[in-house]
């Protein structure tokens, strides 16, 4: 058996009912021993690898479409297609398939698509072919009923399709449509609508080629205007002929290409606007219509790519200063639609498409267009740029780095994009949101290439911070020259929030580039000015920026923060927020809590030494008292290194206990009844101090009342505080070398050593414990950050007992948190 080789593309249908291009190669047919039968083989033209090996199954339904397509299904959800470059090759392979299956090559389908019951199959096979009634006005109702009754059965659909095709019935129907329309025969027009709609559901390429021909397509659209479900006919033909005009911005010399564009537009219009929304059943029956449109689009893109004169003229006129504004607007819109058109293509086709545009100079052309005054032209150019960035950000990076060697910073492509983002006139900044997303893609190291010769990340980030970062941060720097934002309107705040979002992304991903920029330009101080904004979302963006910096635990950043006293605006914002429990309050507390939990020693000391006076009255969370405790522990370790070593030994000893010991102790704890405790007795788990339920159940209303009483005091402290003097901040305290006691610490008699429960602490140590031994718990588990104060009676009892230097009741034990 001689092999016939033809150039083909192999496609598979994905879950979204879109065709995926699997590659280009040459097809042959031959006997394959492994399959014990004749098979189709496609080998890639690039490397000879096997793209397809498919046995020609005698029971598989193969379809020939558009003279150059063969489509079939190999499994329930696995459809394949071969798209031939030449009709002759398609015919030869089709003959081979029909020869194996014993079918007539003149048919376009070899099998029934869906299996039917044996009785139905026998009845249909034994009956003669479908006989269509004469195409006459008085027989339209009979024909409509015949079509409707044939659609549920695949065999009857096939027979109906063959009868309609062989008798040239479509053209006869269209002639009858003109008669009915001239006579205003509404009933006849309704029947013709049902018949034409049914012919679409026959899902047959040969019928589509007749209906979508230049002579018939407008009449087919006319037939579909008279939907019986609508009181008045639609005016689709009027729209297509009078409203929708084909603008040839660049003359298309190829008449076949022009015809293909017209046909595809009209068929797409039929699918989207004319045909009623299909049911799930009908959707599957329109698969051939989807394929018809898809392959038409592939052909159009390929023909335009191959027409070098067309693309050369397009880019030449785009960048020519002599081109008038209206013409340029049409050219840019065409290019935008061309790029949008490519999004329906599969990756291989799309790669070839954008590679062609890149070779033709699309990026230099965009640079020229973005520098023009026409807002609509610039907006269309921005959309084109987004397609390029999404397709291949490395291509865009390479271009902008090359142009930086020749052009000034003001006209660099990325800087033009940043300027458009800054100057977005949309009140909701829709364009700016799109552009900031593109910039993030460009500066994202995750999609940057690294080769043996060069590292794209290093080169591009060096370029970006040298030539572009000052343009991006300009609005931020211009608006933060004073202690509060110069402009605090909603649109400006939105823009600054977008810029801060990108800067925060840079902090997380760019290491030393962004670090040098922040420290050298004092960016964090400027950003923290925005915490005074009246827009909470902007203040939170500023806090998030600082939180990301602190989260890096980088001592360069920490020294920069301490040297410039950059916690001052944060504490100002915290005190100005007062007793309101909102995102601002939570974000600031979480920032300090992170410093405490992660034991960032330098920042802990800085906060306590400079701002303790402003924070010591904040007692509804343990965060600040915990920071003070951390600080005192640090000082104690500095003063007594031996004690630090002993605590380390005790801590390690505790960690070595096995799990069963811990479980037994927990069980004892939960079995202990609070009523069994004597006055002043304390139940302490091995590693934690405990609070009684009274502390947790005190009414929130009483707590809120106390906070309101403290509000004037907080504001008075803030008013007296002068944050302007960086060298001598008003919150700074002078600590002597002697050991200090936490404000929440009980007398020495109630202190606990980290080693064992109930043992007295070391002399003079107060209620100190190791960092791993300070989480506050109750019988129900760990307590959150909020710790409600005790009632007045307990405070009086507390004062009396302190004067007697006796152990505190459980409700007044020191609240420690690590």
From Swiss-Prot:
Pfam family, one: PP4R3
Family: Belongs to the SMEK family.
Annotated Polar residues bias: 721-730
Record lineage: Eukaryota, Metazoa, Chordata, Craniata, Vertebrata
Subunit organization: Serine/threonine-protein phosphatase 4 (PP4) occurs in different assemblies of the catalytic and one or more regulatory subunits.
Coiled coil region boundaries: none
Organism: Tetraodon nigroviridis (Spotted green pufferfish)
Protein name, UniProt field: Serine/threonine-protein phosphatase 4 regulatory subunit 3
PANTHER family membership: ATP SYNTHASE GAMMA-RELATED, SERINE_THREONINE-PROTEIN PHOSPHATASE 4 REGULATORY SUBUNIT 3A
GO biological process: DNA damage response
Region (Disordered): 718-818
